[in-house]
Amino acid sequence: MSVNATNLGLSIEQAGKVLNAAFKQATGQEVISQLATGDYVSIATMAQRVGYEQMTNALSQVLTRTYIRVRAYSAKFRSLIKTEEQYGNMVRKITYIDRDIPEGDMTRDIEDGKEYSPYKVRKPQAIQTAYYGFNHIDDYITIFKNQWDTALSSGSELQRFISGIMQEWYNKLEQYHEQYSRATLINLIGGTQAYNADTAVKGAGITRPEMVRHLLTEYNTEHGTTLTRDALLADRTAFTQFAEDLAYKMDTIVRQMGERTTMYHVSPLKSVTENGTTAVTVPIKRHTPRENLQCYMLAPFWDRVKRVVRPGLFANEYLEYIKFDEVAFWQNIETPEKINANVSYFKPVAATVASSKTTYAVNNDSGNAAVELPYVLGVMFDDEAAAICYKNMWSAATPMNPAHGFQTNYIHEDVQWRNDNTENCCVLLLD
């Protein structure tokens, strides 16, 4: 397969700089700070003298450090990707719980003959949440001796050689990165729905209906209609009204998430009666400023809005501040609107059935469920509700195989992802 070097924006001058950096990596010497065309042959000759093994290993490290790390952030769902420092601050999260203001007036409720100590203890209440997953990526590519010989013969050949290596690694890593990010988002969407559908959660009366909006049902209720999804999409007048209603509702969600409340997220459970009739949560209050709100929407739906309604409907003073990304498909490109997955979610309460009797208990652990959603329109969430981080990337090359004249370059990378259902999230369904 031929590779066009310009696909990755790599010029001959840049290729020379990469070779220069690799030479320095292998030998500790920097030949020249700015590599001109006339200087190319001399450094190529010196590189050959260093040896294929050292140069390939050094080149592998330089490409990984200089190019692949930068390119890794161009995959879809890029706003989910966090740096190691950002991700580290999320993994072990301490949340402080508001306590009620003491009743009475300490400065006026004073009686003669009584002592009043200023050393009263009022401990702060806090909880720690940690939700995370881990995986590892390995990839490798083989380079032959005659490729090196050809690559070091001219600047244009080196350009094609390095671009070929980068194209191979870049395509694979980008695809892996996108799939991990997609899975992270799918789990957030499906997990939010699974929480509200959980029988124990419903039995204890701690569902969060505002976290999952059934927009078609809402539309039919508000307008006194009984439209199906297909009928709504086919009716220009009804669809226009639906889109305008949706813009208003999204504005409302943005404003509500910006307030510090217990809405749009799950709170841990403090206690629950055996029959589930009385559940006491530990009320976590969250707020999501607009700059911290992420929004992913199904692209085919927005294409229809632009064509049928009007292009600027969702470019108003509120929505223009959302990190608004269109998604071509959630899980399968052939059925872009559907999600069908096994998901994990935060489950505060557990229910046990024995002899036709259901008893409830505090759980505050993870739950698992199979979720099938026929039409996911979008999701709006705090940027701490879902995150993914790539770290510990490194590469190395094997010695040259003397019998067959090749060596293999390996690249390794760790992937960590997380969902936090105690952060604000709202799933928009067209059902």
Task: Go through the PLM ranges and name each one.
Residues 54-141:
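Assembly/oligomerization interface modules of large self-assembling protein complexes
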Residues 194-342:
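Extended, solvent-exposed, turn-rich assembly/linker loops in the middle of proteins
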Residues 1-70, 299-431:
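Extended, compositionally biased alpha-helical segments that mediate assembly or anchoring
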Residues 77, 127-130, 280-284, 395-397:
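Intrinsically disordered, low-complexity boundary segments flanking structured domains
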Residues 128-200, 406-413:
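Long, contiguous amphipathic alpha-helices that act as assembly "spine/axial" helices in icosahedral shell
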Residues 97, 144-146, 363:
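A structural detector for beta-sheet-dominated domains
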